[in-house]
């Protein structure tokens, strides 16, 4: 198998997870294994953990399941996220589609380093981190509600809140 990815490692775009799920999907098709999309995503998590990349927790769902979605899962070792599809009009309607920008800074960091810091804080029962993670869970639901309602103003406000939460969770969100 030969792969070419023109996206640099550590870009934050989930490339390793998406590539791993693509390879597993190709093996599934070639061998007639009859895996569904959830199986491929679960096997991607296992593969990424075996390779010690630290990724594979959610990125592959973005690539394997099309469209705008909210992923929800319960606490515990075995993750079986529920995929809830959302309308895409805030991203495709002519009044809104030009209001979105994905900007790549060229600064790279690997998921392994980022997740090590976050998981360490969870295992140490860091009150501020656990509280922030709970807030982020509620925030994701608020964001999906804004998208469902087509409320662009609320959506934009929540994007700002997402940025603030990411900065609080990960000290490297704004590297020097």
Language model features: what each stretch is:
Residues 42-52, 60-176:
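C-terminal nucleotide
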Residues 10-21, 55-69:
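FAD-binding core of FAD-dependent oxidoreductases
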Residues 1-46:
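Anion-binding (especially nucleotide phosphate/pyrophosphate-binding) glycine-rich loop
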Residues 29-33, 53, 164:
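A generic secondary-structure boundary signal that marks alpha-helix termini
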């Amino acid at each position: 198998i030969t792969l070419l990815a023109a996206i640099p490692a550590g870009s934050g775009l989930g490339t390793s997870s998406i590539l791993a799920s693509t390879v597993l999907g190709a093996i599934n098709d070639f061998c007639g294994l009859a895996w569904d999309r959830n199986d491929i995503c679960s096997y991607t998590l296992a593969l990424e953990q075996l390779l010690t990349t630290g990724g594979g927790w959610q990125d592959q769902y973005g690539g394997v399941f099309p469209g705008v979605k909210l992923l929800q899962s319960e606490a515990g070792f075995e993750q079986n996220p529920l995929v809830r599809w959302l309308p895409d009009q805030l991203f495709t309607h002519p009044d809104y589609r030009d209001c979105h920008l994905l900007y790549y800074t060229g600064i790279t960091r690997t998921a392994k380093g980022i997740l090590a810091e976050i998981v360490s804080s969870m295992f140490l029962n860091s009150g501020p981190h656990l509280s922030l993670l709970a807030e982020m869970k509620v925030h994701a639901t608020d964001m999906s509600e804004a998208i469902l309602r087509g409320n662009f103003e609320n959506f934009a406000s929540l994007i700002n809140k997402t940025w603030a939460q990411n900065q609080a969770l990960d000290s490297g969100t704004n590297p020097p």
